[in-house]
Amino acid sequence: MRYIGNKENVIPRMYEILIHKGIAGRSLFDFFSGTTSVSKFYKRLGYTVSSSDFMYFSYCLQKAYIENNSTPTFERLLPLPIVSPLKSCASPLDRVIAYLNELEPEEGFIYNNYTPEGTYHLSQPRMYFSNENGKKIDTIRQQIERWKNDNLLLGNEYYILLASLIAVSYTHLRAH
């Protein structure tokens, strides 16, 4: 995920320098975690990772990728008739995401503030997302929030779904 200040391209070099200089340790504090690239790299290497950032999107990514250490089961959500089984081999996360992708798009905050149609009244309409992608993001975000409010998501399942939405939304920036 590209983000101002993202260190993804320099992480391997940073690690090489630490090894070359003989700087050893098994824990890392990522002060400006952002997209969690540094934290994820060191977590994969078995480090104990602590991370921090002021941005809420980063907090969601940290909860999903750094704090979370288990595969989500969605045990409260999957038994409901609204989330039908796809294939027996589909993971619980895949089944939930498939359901979310089938929802009928509706206008909301992202559509009204970050799409050409939603901001037609501005002298320069915003084009961060296509109209359709803006609606889809709104629909999925609202459904995730309803599930959270209805106590249908356990542990970090809420953050895993938000992190998935953040990641896929990023890939659709300016996708017209």
Where are these regions (language model features)?
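S-adenosyl-L-methionine
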Residues: 1-23
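SAM cofactor-binding core of SAM-dependent methyltransferases
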Residues: 35-86
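Conserved small/polar residues in nucleotide/adenosyl-binding loops
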Residues: 171-176
